[in-house]
Design a protein with these regions (language model features):
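N-terminal cap/leader regions of alpha/beta-hydrolase-fold enzymes
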Residues: 1-251
């Protein structure tokens, strides 16, 4: 956990939910920025279920997968033909390690229930923490953006939800969402962004608060300033909206 060094007393808490790359240096840096804005920031490592990451999700293996992804077209990790071409010429052991890590990452994306359970545990931990004043929000990115929305469907203790370019919850679940929600989306991020209008309509019909912004021309992961996808102007605007939203709903 991270908190402002000079702050006194209990603070609102924000759970920072990591991308598919895990709780890496970028996510820890984001947590530091949130703490600097006056919050208790907590980054659960969802890949370390039970306290230890499996070998295929170890940081060095994830870094190798990132480097491989950077050699592919956008979305290439999910494209079998693009992966096949990218893996050509690699040693067999290296190919196997990259594919093993990719399968592990995508398994979590496709089956998020365990991660949501772990996030409920993170909420409970914060509610019992002396540095938390009981006001809890989430800010999630990519995989974590989708998880933030799912957590809001199931946990009434979450008071504010910010989802960066994560798939919204199913429209049928809009009525179960307990907190106001801010969605940050990328124009060049189909099919995720294509699902936003139906979700927005469902939230409005259910009387729920859902503010959202789609950044035209921005790719998935445009906020990650360690990746080629980073876009400065979209990131500046999205971050300003995020801090305003957290201040409004968490104090």
């Amino acid at each position: 956990m991270v908190r402002p060094a000079a702050a006194r007393g209990a603070l609102p808490a924000v759970i920072v939910i990591h991308e598919a790359w895990g709780a890496d240096a970028h996510i820890r840096d984001v947590a530091g920025r949130i703490a600097s804005a006056g919050y208790l920031a907590f980054v659960p490592d969802l890949y370390a279920h039970g306290g230890t990451r499996p070998a295929e999700l170890a940081p060095d293996r994830i870094d190798a997968l990132k480097r491989f992804a950077d050699t592919l077209p956008p979305g290439g990790l999910g494209d079998p033909e693009a992966r096949r071409r990218g893996l050509e010429g690699m040693a067999e052991t290296e190919r196997e390690r990259i594919e093993e890590s990719r399968r592990a990452v995508f398994a979590g994306i496709k089956n998020p229930d365990r991660f949501v359970d772990d996030l409920r545990g993170a909420v409970d931990r914060l509610l019992d923490h002396p540095d938390c004043n009981g006001q809890i929000g989430t800010v999630g990115f990519c995989l974590g953006g989708g998880l933030a929305g799912l957590l809001a469907c199931d946990d009434g203790d979450v008071r504010a939800t910010v989802a960066y370019y994560g798939a919204p919850p199913p429209a049928a679940r809009a009525g179960t969402i307990s907190s106001p929600m801010l969605g940050i989306y990328a124009g060049k991020d189909r099919p995720i962004t294509d699902t936003v209008p139906a979700f927005a309509d469902a939230m409005a019909a259910a009387g729920k608060s859902f503010d959202h912004r789609v950044y035209p021309g921005a790719p998935h992961a445009f906020f990650n300033d360690t990746r080629p996808s980073y876009r400065v102007r979209a990131s500046r605007d999205a971050w300003a909206r995020t801090l305003t939203f957290l201040a409004e709903h968490l104090g």
